């Protein structure tokens, strides 16, 4: 990557098309991950002519994701699982968890449309088992369709909001992201949409300030495709553009695994910048620490390089990873004792084992007296079922006082963290790409990681797929003013 890889990609004026338009449609969708598939389906079912293209075979990062969709407000899956929820409760929680204003129109639209969007997904072949997995973790062990996926049941949120599970997991024993994409792909195949793979969009085409199409490269030739109603960018983010990462989110360059594909090269971001779009949340990131239940992991203690706790261990694993990378210079250790040690799901083991906390501290390079004091204070409070420092739930509090003691290495430099940037092109509640003054760029829409996330502070698993598919459809509703036809608010 070079400095040129951060430069805006300027649009092409329609007058510069030497060969005119090779193809024409109502809606041009660029990218066929979950967001692009949802947008393409919605447009085709609304009666529009659709050309949907992807630089590879489709699926994108969505196909390799965990498949969770963050939905709520009282979905049928929630109700059948015995859980109650409202759009207002969902919005209040997400406003705090994601760092959005509670009256942000985009957040309001997403929460108020959650039930309808859930039903649309189900109607298009994405089932959810009405069963609730109530323990911390990245995903349920079976086909349970509901999980806590944003620390809803942990501090600080449980002090302010009634915990509600909103992470909806498609009913499949494994590879839920791939399953979601396949079901949406099958739904798209039942429409009249034209699907083009191995075709790369190069530049958007404008006419008098309106986006009217794009140039596309395939098999060494470039042609122009006209879009009479609008262009939807759903072609991924910028996790694999190291020049953009260095400029906006340099800490992501320190982790071993950036979630994405080579399609996450920042093309959508650079293209919208070329049209004067506003960007937001560029330093915000999701970073997952690869420590998952069993319970023993949550019952352990996480300390930084000074031997001090800095977070409640029962919270969402993305919050833990973000705190380690952003606030602790990438240094952390998970401490446990003999009765509570079990190898966690990803096989991480306590490589350092000692008879005292002081000895363990010396072995892993922490201040012995400080670590001993940390553990003494924690154990004393845990014996009373309390955590006055970080308010870990009582069910996960046990004294760690039975030798030998072990340390699992959570340092960013030594284990496989996974993450991706959440910032990007700002869109409004109708998925329109907007300028810094809030005015929309006519004819241009974005969804998924081609747009900025709702998450401006912290992340909740399922937001990317949830908002991507939701705003992919929302773009179509705005193009055709078919909110009633599509049953969108």
Name the predicted role of every residue range.
Residues 1-27, 45, 454, 487-488:
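Extreme N-terminal leader/targeting segments of oxidoreductases
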Residues 27-51:
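N-terminal Rossmann-like FAD-binding beta1-loop-alpha1 element of flavoenzymes
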Residues 45-65:
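Glycine-rich FAD pyrophosphate-binding loop
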Residues 70-109, 122:
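Glycine-rich active-site loop/strand segments that organize a redox cofactor
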Residues 109-222, 242-243, 385-407:
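Conserved redox-cofactor binding core of oxidoreductases
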Residues 175, 220-289, 465, 471-474:
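Glycine-rich loop(s) and the adjacent beta-strand/alpha-helix scaffold that form part
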Residues 203, 372-458:
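A glycine-rich dinucleotide-binding beta-alpha-beta segment and adjacent secondary-structure elements
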Residues 265, 269-271, 275-372:
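An anion/pyrophosphate-binding glycine-rich loop and adjacent beta-alpha core
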């Amino acid at each position: 990557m070079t400095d040129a890889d951060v430069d805006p990609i300027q649009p092409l004026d329609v007058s510069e098309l030497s060969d005119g338009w090779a193809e024409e449609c109502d809606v041009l969708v660029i990218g066929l991950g979950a967001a692009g598939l949802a947008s393409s389906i919605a447009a085709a079912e609304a009666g529009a002519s659709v050309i949907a293209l992807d630089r590879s075979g489709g699926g994108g990062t969505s196909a390799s994701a965990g498949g969770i969709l963050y939905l709520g407000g009282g979905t049928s899956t929630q109700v059948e699982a015995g859980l109650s929820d409202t759009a207002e409760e969902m919005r209040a929680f997400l406003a705090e968890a994601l760092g959005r204003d509670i009256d942000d129109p985009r957040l309001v639209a997403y929460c108020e449309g959650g039930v309808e969007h859930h039903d649309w997904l189900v109607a298009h072949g994405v089932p959810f088992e009405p069963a609730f997995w109530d323990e911390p973790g990245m995903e349920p062990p079976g086909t349970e369709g509901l999980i806590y996926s944003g620390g809803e049941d942990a501090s600080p949120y449980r002090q302010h909001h009634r915990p509600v599970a909103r992470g909806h997991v498609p009913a499949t024993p494994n590879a839920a992201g791939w399953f979601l994409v396949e079901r949406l792909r099958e739904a798209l195949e039942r429409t009249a949409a034209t699907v083009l793979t191995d075709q790369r969009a190069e530049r958007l085409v404008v006419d008098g300030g309106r986006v009217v199409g794009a140039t596309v490269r395939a098999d060494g030739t470039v042609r122009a495709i006209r879009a009479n109603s609008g262009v939807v960018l759903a072609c991924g983010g910028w996790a694999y553009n190291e020049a953009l990462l260095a400029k906006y989110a340099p800490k992501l360059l320190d982790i071993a695994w950036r979630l994405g594909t080579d399609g996450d090269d920042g093309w959508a971001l650079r293209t919208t910048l070329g049209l004067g779009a506003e960007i937001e949340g560029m330093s915000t990131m999701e970073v997952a620490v690869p420590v998952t239940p069993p319970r023993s992991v949550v019952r352990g203690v996480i300390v930084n390089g000074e031997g001090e706790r800095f977070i409640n261990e029962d919270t969402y694993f993305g919050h833990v990873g973000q705190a380690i990378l952003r606030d602790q210079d990438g240094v952390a250790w998970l401490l446990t004792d003999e009765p509570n040690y079990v190898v966690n799901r990803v096989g991480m083991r306590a490589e350092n084992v000692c008879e005292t906390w002081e000895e363990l501290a010396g072995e892993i390079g922490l201040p012995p007296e400080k670590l001993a004091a940390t553990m003494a204070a924690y154990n004393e409070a845990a014996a009373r079922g309390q955590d006055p420092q970080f308010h870990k739930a009582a069910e996960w509090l046990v004294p760690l006082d039975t030798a030998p003691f072990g340390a699992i290495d959570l340092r960013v430099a030594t284990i496989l963290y996974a993450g991706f940037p959440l910032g990007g092109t700002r869109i409004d509640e109708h998925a329109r790409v907007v300028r810094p003054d809030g005015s929309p760029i006519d004819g241009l829409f974005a969804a998924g990681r081609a747009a900025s996330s709702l998450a401006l502070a912290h992340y909740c698993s399922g937001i990317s797929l949830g908002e991507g598919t939701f705003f992919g459809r929302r773009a179509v509703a705005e193009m055709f003013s078919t909110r009633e036809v599509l049953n969108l608010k």
